[in-house]
Amino acid sequence: MDELIWEKYPYLYETHLHTSESSACSRSTGAEMARACKEYGYTGIFVTDHNWGGNTAVDRSLPWDEWVDIFALGYEHAKAEGDQIGLDVFFGYEAGYQGTEFLIYGIDAAWMKDHPELVKATVEEQYCLVHEAGGLVIHAHPYREEAYIPEIRLYPEWVDGVEGINATHSNPQSTGHNDPQYDLRAVAYAREHKLPISAGSDIHGTHLFGGGVAFRRKLTSVADYARAILTGEDYVLTDGAKWYDKFGNVIEGNR
């Protein structure tokens, strides 16, 4: 990481992370992910496991409250470990709609239990529900092309921002979904609709890429993160290999 950028923006957050307790595609537990991220130098992480509409590890036939309790275990284990080692851990999830996915921030498991209608909510209804709770909806990797994504669908009116930098697309260490064009198109889409841009690693194991969003100050909560993104606070983005300004432009001279 470039030392000058690191000095100006010392608080790095992983915004897209999966755990094996809750995401069927993840290889590492919440506690293992927390330890790896702390060792890497992250200030905090957002646990964003796949929900019922995506690659969840939780039995969809369970009663709703029980499903939520088990779904939250990845976050809870990461949070318990983070509290011990000095890593901030925040709750979120990745909502799936036949391959189109959204990162949800600013709500918690208790709120989910109170809103079982989430399971059948449309993209538009999801946005309204999350907003009523003061949350944030980010369109995850909108231009990724994979077998599990039958078509690219865009919802600029029903998101608060776009994950323009996804480290699995652009970090040289990535062995899956690796195509920088996905990010270039996502950034262009965000600019066209004047939507804030975020970054994350979409990480599923302890071999970290180092992607995320870095701030000049330490975040106090998920709500604080939402405010920072929505109000245009000063931050930078990274895929772990390059740094970008908040508009998705490569910061020249970084390494």
Describe these PLM feature segments:
Residues 1-15, 19, 30-35, 98-110, ...:
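Charged catalytic cores and adjacent phosphate/nucleic-acid-binding surfaces used
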Residues 142-145:
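Extracellular glycoside hydrolase catalytic/binding regions
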Residues 1-97, 205-207:
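An N-terminally biased module of ancient metal coordination in phosphate/nucleic-acid-related enzymes
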Residues 23-28, 59, 114-117, 174-177:
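Short, solvent-exposed loop/turn segments at secondary-structure boundaries
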Residues 64-65, 110-116:
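Glycine-rich tight-turn/loop motif centered on a GG-T
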Residues 65-78, 119-124, 179-183:
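Well-ordered, non-membrane alpha-helical segments in soluble/globular domains
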Residues 45-47, 138-139, 163:
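Conserved beta-strand positions in the central sheet of alpha/beta enzyme cores
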